[in-house]
């Protein structure tokens, strides 16, 4: 049985970093996939699918549902261990509903929790624009601009209330304060995940 944790949070909340640190500390038990990283890897491969994905990411728009679902299901089924952290999903009510329907049909996938790494828009903005300023030449992300940040933030916040209600009603939502130090956030998330597996 694959135990799945979905990690959501605003752009710049630190969700990807938090999850990757936890997975690195427990490589024999936990694996981390970022939907963003999975999609960016496809873009880097230069495939036709990658070119399609790139056109959405560069604008800060949502990648089509079928592409994301296929990417996530493949990652879960091929995961080398039984505990999987996936961050950056779901980002819309449509994604949430489609994924819930899929998981409910799968006997070997247990959605254990949806962890929200909560930060204010001000903190998220400072982190994202700071990340752009600190990027080495050639390592800038096309989605780290103020205009794209505003679009990404709107895409994140618009469906957030519905996503929170949906997972709260199922008893699956856990909120972690992402405005603390990296060590504090990682420590709380790690203890929570380990307590559930």
From Swiss-Prot:
Compartments, as annotated in UniProt: Cytoplasm
Region span, NMP: 34-63
Transferase among keywords: yes
Record: residues binding AMP: 35, 40, 61-63, 88-91, 95, 141, 152
The protein's annotated pathway: Purine metabolism; AMP biosynthesis via salvage pathway; AMP from ADP: step 1/1
Known catalytic reactions: AMP + ATP = 2 ADP
Spans annotated as LID: 130-144
GO cellular component: cytoplasm
InterPro entries in alphabetical order: Adenylat/UMP-CMP_kin, Adenylat_kinase_CS, P-loop_NTPase
Domain notes: Consists of three domains, a large central CORE domain and two small peripheral domains, NMPbind and LID, which undergo movements during catalysis. The LID domain closes over the site of phosphoryl transfer upon ATP binding. Assembling and dissambling the active center during each catalytic cycle provides an effective means to prevent ATP hydrolysis.
Protein name as catalogued: Adenylate kinase
């Amino acid at each position: 049985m694959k135990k799945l944790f979905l990690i959501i949070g605003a752009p710049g909340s630190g969700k990807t970093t938090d999850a990757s640190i936890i997975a690195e500390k427990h490589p024999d038990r936990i694996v981390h996939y970022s939907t963003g990283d999975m999609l960016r890897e496809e873009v880097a491969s230069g495939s036709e699918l990658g070119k399609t994905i790139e056109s959405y990411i560069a604008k800060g728009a949502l990648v089509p549902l079928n592409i994301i679902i296929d990417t996530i299901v493949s990652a879960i089924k091929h995961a080398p261990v039984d505990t999987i952290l996936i961050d950056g999903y779901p980002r819309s009510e449509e994604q949430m509903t489609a994924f819930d329907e899929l998981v409910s049909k799968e006997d070997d996938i247990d959605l254990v929790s949806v962890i929200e790494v909560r930060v204010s828009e001000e903190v998220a903005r400072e982190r994202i624009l700071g990340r752009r300023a600190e990027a080495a030449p050639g390592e800038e992300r096309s989605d780290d601009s103020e205009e794209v940040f505003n679009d990404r933030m709107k895409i994140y916040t618009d469906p957030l209330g519905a996503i929170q209600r949906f997972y709260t009603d199922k008893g699956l939502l856990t909120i972690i304060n992402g405005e603390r130090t990296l060590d504090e956030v990682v420590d709380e998330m790690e203890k929570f995940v380990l307590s559930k597996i």
